[in-house]
Amino acid sequence: MLTTSIAGYQKSKHCGYCKQKDGSCSYYMSCDNMRVDHYQELMDRGWRRSGTTYYKPDLPRSCCPHYTIRLKASDFKAKKEQRSAINKLNSYVIGPEYRRKAAMLCPEPRDIKRQKRDHFDVVSAVHKAEYERLAKPVGKKTKDAIQPAHKFEVNLEPDSCTKEKHDVMLRYQTEIHKDPEWRWTEASFERFLCNGLDRKLLKVKGKTMKLGSHHMCYRLDGKLVAVGVLDLLPHAVSSVYLFYDPDYQEWDWGKISAMHEIALVIEKGYEYYYMGYYIHSCTKMRYKGRFEPSYILDPESLEWNLLDDEFRKKLDKRKYVSLSEDQRIQAHEGSDGRNHRSLPNETRSEPSIVEDVTTKKLEPELKGEEIELDSEPSDPDDTEIPDGSLFDYNIPGVLKKGEVEKLNLGTMKLLVRTSLIDLEDLRGWEEWQIDDPGTIKGIVAELIATTGPKLLKDTALALF
């Protein structure tokens, strides 16, 4: 049984991406016992987690709309710059001396060489220089196994908090992102990037799948140089965060880690690779769309659409794009291309949904390592709670009031100290309205509208 606490629909006063004060709107909840299958369901409805805080952005009311992006790993076609990032690291690790000796002691057949040259295999490429997988033929004279120039190891480990990891994280945040040191105490690191989803093993078709939150740790000559924070789900590997030692920033860790994670998806059968949110207006985020073919979750229909040049052109012109909404408008309201989403009369100002962003000055193209990862949710002190019910705001991907009214919300549980109570047994339950956020029924209705009905029977609400 999931135990959730509700923060509700909130508007932030500051954007961590564009630094403007327009901010964005999201629905927030917290859960410290989230199941991997439930989180998979939430991600496919546009949710994301930061520690035990879960949030679903309201894209039309965001200055920088967050689009869920994923890749079917088996279809991945590496681009030149992605291949170069892995090849550069492999060449450094192996070294010229090892390469020369290995070519003499165990030469590759020509057809194998030709196959490798003509076809890039991401799984083989990412493991090529890993020490435990590297061939170590014995020298004819020395009778000793030849060794690479460096010992490179990649291991999937529990997402535990250690001094070694925290030290790397602290240097990364302070030197790369210029954060103040006080912001990333060991407790903060543990809260946001450690002890996430519960870990367990699942056997599927003879394969053992690891599930839950893990750290993919990269070590060079015994030293921890980078850590990828991952959520392993029944049908996906979700990239949560990446941090690395600034002494090794010459390596393109954004591409290197993504290719290792794609290889993990392929090898272990997770099927999809989620890279968090894609923010088209943030140039540092566009590297995510370079892993092709990537798909964007339609905010309205919750279907997946290919992120191709046609889609990018739409995003160049409009911050908010929903192909299903565009099709509906063209079919029923004309083909002027404008988004006629009905918004309520509100006292607060809203960012324009159809704002033309082509006139804005774009940031220069960036090196691969200069990447922007998903920011954490807004500080509660930097938010405000809009008036009215969630159903007044017509949020994409959220159940409408009429849809929620058809659900039996009373079967959901309320956690009171250590006891679970059916909501329908509460005094006043039948009189309460689902569009009244001041009642427990209204709170539950908004929660299920945003999470979807599948979580209804497995969730308990904690109010205190």
Residue ranges and their predicted role:
Residues 4, 27-31, 154-161, 178, ...:
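Generic alpha-helical structural element
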Residues 10, 20-41, 49-50, 113, ...:
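Acyl-donor binding region in acyl/amide transferases
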Residues 53, 57-61, 74-75, 82-250, ...:
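A conserved beta-strand-loop-helix scaffold within acyl/acetyltransferase catalytic domains
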Residues 69-71, 197-198, 316-317:
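Short alpha-helix boundary/capping motifs
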